[in-house]
């Protein structure tokens, strides 16, 4: 495997995995808060 498709020293698949995980976490927390009435009060 070559590092031609990387930005700096971080592989794009690693960046995508981290960003995707954080995005899913934020969405999960949003729906969790909305389900328990915390998000709807904002």
Curated annotation (Swiss-Prot):
The chain crosses the membrane at residues 10-30. Pfam families: PsbJ. Coiled coil: none annotated. Keywords: Chloroplast, Membrane, Photosynthesis, Photosystem II, Plastid, Reaction center, Thylakoid, Transmembrane, Transmembrane helix. InterPro entries: PSII_PsbJ (IPR002682), PSII_PsbJ_sf (IPR037267). One of the components of the core complex of photosystem II (PSII). PSII is a light-driven water:plastoquinone oxidoreductase that uses light energy to abstract electrons from H(2)O, generating O(2) and a proton gradient subsequently used for ATP formation. It consists of a core antenna complex that captures photons, and an electron transfer chain that converts photonic excitation into a charge separation. PSII is composed of 1 copy each of membrane proteins PsbA, PsbB, PsbC, PsbD, PsbE, PsbF, PsbH, PsbI, PsbJ, PsbK, PsbL, PsbM, PsbT, PsbX, PsbY, PsbZ, Psb30/Ycf12, at least 3 peripheral proteins of the oxygen-evolving complex and a large number of cofactors. It forms dimeric complexes. This is Photosystem II reaction center protein J.
């Amino acid at each position: 495997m070559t590092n031609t498709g990387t930005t700096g020293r971080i592989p794009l698949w690693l960046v995508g995995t981290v960003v995707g995980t954080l995005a899913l976490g934020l969405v999960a927390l949003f729906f969790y808060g909305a389900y328990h009435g915390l998000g709807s009060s904002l």
